[in-house]
Amino acid sequence: MEYSTFGKHIIVDLWGVDFSLLDDMYFLEHHLIHAADLSGAHVLNVSTKEFDPHGVTVLVLLSESHLSIHTYPEQNFAAIDCYTCGTTVEPQIAIDYIVSILKPNEMHIRRLIRGIGEIVNTD
């Protein structure tokens, strides 16, 4: 079987997110898994890390690639990354869901197409 190298990669910076949401590893883990499911991705594994005194990283390993969040609660900031290979998964659905639960005051986003030669910025 031949596989396509085509992929969609979305990177997002969120500012003005509630401290308590960004410092709750279990809340974020639950919602990232749900976001992956909504996008049509298949979750293989989840890795989490709480930092001292604050901050969380959640990495959701997908059959199609990955979904991750790194938080800096003291700055009310989160960095989200979602990369999916192929055409059967829509990473924007995962991103939209996460943004809807974190409710940032400000968002910066880049959408890239990868695996077709040159990386294409679709913004």
Curated annotation (Swiss-Prot):
EC number: 4.1.1.50
UniProt PTM: Is synthesized initially as an inactive proenzyme. Formation of the active enzyme involves a self-maturation process in which the active site pyruvoyl group is generated from an internal serine residue via an autocatalytic post-translational modification. Two non-identical subunits are generated from the proenzyme in this reaction, and the pyruvate is formed at the N-terminus of the alpha chain, which is derived from the carboxyl end of the proenzyme.
Residues that bear Pyruvic acid (Ser): S65
Domain of life, per lineage: Bacteria
Gene Ontology biological process: spermidine biosynthetic process
SUPFAM superfamilies: S-adenosylmethionine decarboxylase
Site features described as Cleavage (non-hydrolytic), chain residue numbers: E64, S65
Pathway entry: Amine and polyamine biosynthesis; S-adenosylmethioninamine biosynthesis; S-adenosylmethioninamine from S-adenosyl-L-methionine: step 1/1
UniProt-recorded Gene Ontology molecular function terms: adenosylmethionine decarboxylase activity
Presence of keyword Membrane: no
Subunit structure: Heterotetramer of two alpha and two beta chains arranged as a dimer of alpha/beta heterodimers.
Role of this protein: Catalyzes the decarboxylation of S-adenosylmethionine to S-adenosylmethioninamine (dcAdoMet), the propylamine donor required for the synthesis of the polyamines spermine and spermidine from the diamine putrescine.
Entry similarity comment: Belongs to the prokaryotic AdoMetDC family. Type 1 subfamily.
Name of the protein this chain belongs to: S-adenosylmethionine decarboxylase proenzyme 2
Organism this protein belongs to: Bacillus anthracis
